[in-house]
């Protein structure tokens, strides 16, 4: 059975100067700005800093308001929560939100991912073992196989499982009733979902990048749970280099904590945070070596673009999917990159950040 994680909710508590890119990063073995989830040597601490209720979840106010209404309405009618699709860049809290939904509804949850559901029996085994009201979270749901999707259609709409028994002319469909459940799907590529699957979600919500003040609160909350002293300025320094992503903020916090401990610093101040993050090649705007390499390729080798995605991937050593889903969204968000039908172009702001003179200003100097 393809269950990655299955947890029962605990009782409710009693009531979050720019430099040119160098040829190689100082710390090449760990990509501290990659928001993909990774196996942490301190997995228990990673779990402990996850918020468990809406009251602890910082940011995403619009999303929380929508889900709060949906939860209260479902509870008042004694119904299960409608199926929910969460989409947005990685590391913004989609999995955490699914756990919070289970906590707020007072039900259990099961966590899996689409690549783990390769065979029909994988999803069947999950569905038949769901209890009434359970939440089934499927990460990377856009990667579901066609056969798995077709099994989900009647399960989502009518809470039944249609199984084909026999072969050829003697084949028949047998329907097995399922407990009413809530499917929460998460994806970074909502456009890659098929229309039949997407249309079966009653709620479709986007998670946005976080503001610096929200990330500062997250850093301070996590620091307290990790028993690390961080000043307000230190938290802000970490936050503004975190690419608007909580997962990155927490990861940078741990690396800064390590640096402060080795340097025998009683607390993480702004200066200590800046020194540590400089070691990891994270600049004041949150760009790492790969970001700067991308911009450098576009500006220096292709006069600002447009440049094709495959060319950028070859120049940086990253695959195209990672560039599209991890690096480009943030570069576009801060106005350093434009994506056109002909390729990627560097903006005027990117030129200035990288220490180059924009082309139009070069002409004015002639």
From Swiss-Prot:
* Annotated region described as Small ATPAse domain (RuvB-S), given as residue ranges: 211-281
Q: Which transformation does this protein catalyse, written as a reaction?
A: ATP + H2O = ADP + phosphate + H(+)
EC annotation?
Answer: 3.6.4.-
What GO terms are given for molecular function? Answer: ATP binding; ATP hydrolysis activity; four-way junction DNA binding; four-way junction helicase activity
- Coarse class of the primary localization is cytoplasm
Compartments, record wording? Cytoplasm
| Matching Pfam families | AAA_lid_4, RuvB_C, RuvB_N
Q: Which InterPro entries does the annotation name?
A: AAA+_ATPase, AAA_lid_4, DNA_helicase_Holl-junc_RuvB, P-loop_NTPase, RuvB-like_N, RuvB_C, WH-like_DNA-bd_sf, WH_DNA-bd_sf
Q: Which positions does UniProt annotate for ATP binding?
A: 49-50, 91, 94-96, 157-159, 200, 210, 247
- What keywords tag this UniProt record? ATP-binding, Cytoplasm, DNA damage, DNA recombination, DNA repair, DNA-binding, Hydrolase, Nucleotide-binding
In the UniProt record, which is one GO cellular component term? Answer: Holliday junction resolvase complex
According to the record, the residues making up region (Head domain (RuvB-H)) are: 284-366
Q: Where is this region: Disordered?
A: 1-49
The answer on whether this UniProt entry bears the keyword tRNA-binding reads: no
What ranges does the record give for the region Large ATPase domain (RuvB-L), renumbered to this chain?
13-210
| Subunit structure, as described in the record | Homohexamer. Forms an RuvA(8)-RuvB(12)-Holliday junction (HJ) complex. HJ DNA is sandwiched between 2 RuvA tetramers; dsDNA enters through RuvA and exits via RuvB. An RuvB hexamer assembles on each DNA strand where it exits the tetramer. Each RuvB hexamer is contacted by two RuvA subunits (via domain III) on 2 adjacent RuvB subunits; this complex drives branch migration. In the full resolvosome a probable DNA-RuvA(4)-RuvB(12)-RuvC(2) complex forms which resolves the HJ.
Say what the protein does.
The RuvA-RuvB-RuvC complex processes Holliday junction (HJ) DNA during genetic recombination and DNA repair, while the RuvA-RuvB complex plays an important role in the rescue of blocked DNA replication forks via replication fork reversal (RFR). RuvA specifically binds to HJ cruciform DNA, conferring on it an open structure. The RuvB hexamer acts as an ATP-dependent pump, pulling dsDNA into and through the RuvAB complex. RuvB forms 2 homohexamers on either side of HJ DNA bound by 1 or 2 RuvA tetramers; 4 subunits per hexamer contact DNA at a time.
Q: Which NCBIfam families match?
A: PRK00080.1, ruvB
Entry protein name: Holliday junction branch migration complex subunit RuvB
| Source species of the chain | Nostoc sp. (strain PCC 7120 / SAG 25.82 / UTEX 2576)
This protein's encoding gene: ruvB
């Amino acid at each position: 059975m393809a269950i990655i994680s299955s947890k029962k909710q605990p009782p409710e508590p009693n009531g979050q100067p720019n430099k040119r890119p160098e040829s190689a990063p100082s710390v090449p073995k760990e990509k501290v700005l990659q928001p993909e989830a990774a196996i942490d040597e301190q997995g228990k601490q990673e779990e402990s800093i996850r918020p468990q209720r809406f009251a602890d979840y910082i940011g995403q106010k619009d999303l929380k308001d929508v889900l709060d209404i949906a939860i209260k309405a479902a509870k008042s009618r004694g119904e299960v929560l409608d199926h929910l699709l969460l989409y947005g860049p990685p590391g913004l809290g989609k999995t955490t939100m699914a756990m919070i939904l289970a906590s707020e509804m007072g039900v259990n949850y099961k966590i899996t991912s689409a690549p783990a559901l390769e065979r029909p029996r994988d999803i069947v085994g999950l569905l038949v073992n769901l209890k009434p009201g359970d939440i089934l979270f499927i990460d990377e749901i856009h990667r579901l196989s066609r056969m798995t999707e077709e099994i989900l259609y009647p399960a989502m709409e009518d809470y039944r499982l249609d199984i084909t028994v026999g072969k050829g002319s003697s084949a028949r469909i047998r329907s097995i009733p399922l407990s009413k459940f809530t499917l929460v799907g998460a994806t970074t590529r909502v456009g890659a979902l098929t229309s039949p699957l997407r249309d079966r979600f009653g709620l479709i919500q986007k998670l946005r990048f976080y503001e610096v003040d929200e990330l500062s609160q997250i850093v301070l909350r996590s620091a307290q749970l990790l028993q690390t002293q961080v000043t307000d300025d230190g938290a802000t320094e970490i936050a503004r280099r975190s690419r608007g992503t909580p997962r990155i903020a927490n990861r940078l916090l741990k690396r800064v904590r390590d640096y402060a401990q080795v340097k025998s610093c009683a607390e993480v101040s702004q200066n200590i945070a800046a020194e540590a993050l400089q070691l990891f090649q994270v600049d004041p705007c949150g760009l790492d070596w790969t970001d700067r390499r991308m911009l450098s390729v576009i500006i220096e080798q292709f006069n600002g673009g447009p440049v094709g995605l495959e060319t950028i991937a070859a120049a940086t050593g990253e695959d195209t999917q990672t560039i599209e889903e991890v690096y480009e969204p943030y570069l576009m968000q801060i106005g350093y990159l434009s994506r056109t039908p002909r390729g990627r172009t560097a903006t005027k702001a990117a030129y200035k950040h990288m220490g180059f003179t924009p082309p139009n200003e070069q002409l004015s100097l002639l």
